[in-house]
UniProtKB/Swiss-Prot annotation:
EC number annotated for this UniProt entry: 7.1.1.-
InterPro entries, A to Z: 4Fe4S_Fe-S-bd, 4Fe4S_Fe_S_CS, NADH_quinone_OxRdtase_chainI, NDHI
Lineage: Bacteria, Bacillati, Cyanobacteriota, Cyanophyceae, Synechococcales
Family listed: Belongs to the complex I 23 kDa subunit family.
Keyword Translocase in record: yes
Iron-sulfur among keywords: yes
Cofactor note as given: Binds 2 [4Fe-4S] clusters per subunit.
Name of the molecule in the record: NAD(P)H-quinone oxidoreductase subunit I
Any one GO BP annotation for this protein: photosynthesis, light reaction
Organism, as annotated: Parasynechococcus marenigrum (strain WH8102)
Main location: membrane
GO cellular component: plasma membrane-derived thylakoid membrane
Domain annotation 4Fe-4S ferredoxin-type: ranges: 55-84, 95-124
Length: 215
């Protein structure tokens, strides 16, 4: 008799614990149901990358001097620089330049240390291909100008949450011309710039006035 009552008590306790756990799980689910959607209907909607987004690398063949600094600073020695030495001019002549984006980690070291600024990071992130060998971009493919999300008429560009105007939580319906929350990198640099020396300017003006008076 006591064994049967113990089994009933254990079963009731387990049922109460299960109901409590279900209630906790559903409370989290119902709480998220009240929130606005944060998903993007890709590819009809695309997020606008940030100003310093590290996407596909853009390469300018005419600026490259084949110094191979990008190869030395790359953590995996990825860029392939094909050049020959011109005996007449005693300078390197670049033949081909390629980067395999299937291996690239988009760290940006090559862009940062390039002495001629022939490399730059773009906002292009759609590099998917059916063949991994197609991800090996030569200098012609690297020289193609990137396509911006905001200029594509078939896509609705959406801002990321950190770049929405103050008080907005849903990027849908927010026009692109509305000011974003915070400042742009160029505006931050302007605020960090040292102020002009007003005393030196006034001193120069007073000196010029004195010279004019003496004349």
């Amino acid at each position: 008799m006591f064994g049967f009552l113990k089994q009933v008590g254990d079963y009731t306790r387990d049922a109460v614990d299960a109901a409590r756990n279900l209630a906790q799980g559903f409370s989290v689910t119902f709480d998220h149901m009240k929130r606005r959607p944060v998903t993007v209907q890709y590819p009809y909607e695309k997020l606008i990358p940030s100003e310093r987004y590290r996407g596909r690398i853009h390469y300018e063949f005419d600026k490259c001097i084949a110094c191979e600094v990008c190869v030395r600073v790359c953590p995996i020695n990825l860029p392939v620089v094909d050049w020959v030495m011109n005996k007449a001019t005693k300078k390197k002549e670049l033949r081909n330049y390629s980067i395999d984006f299937g291996v690239c980690i988009f760290c940006g070291n090559c862009v940062e240390y390039c002495p001629t600024n022939c490399l730059s990071m773009t906002e292009e992130y759609e590099l998917a291909a059916f063949d991994r060998h197609s991800l090996n971009y030569d200098n012609v493919a690297l020289g193609r100008l990137p396509t911006s999300v905001t200029t594509d008429p078939s896509v609705q560009p959406l801002r990321e949450l950190a770049y929405l105007p103050a008080g907005e939580m849903d990027p849908h319906g927010v026009p692109n011309d509305r000011p974003r929350a915070g400042q742009l990198p160029s505006q931050v640099l302007e605020t960090l710039a040292p102020p002009a020396k007003v005393g030196a300017k006034n001193e120069g003006q007073s000196t010029g006035t004195t010279q004019e008076g003496e004349a």
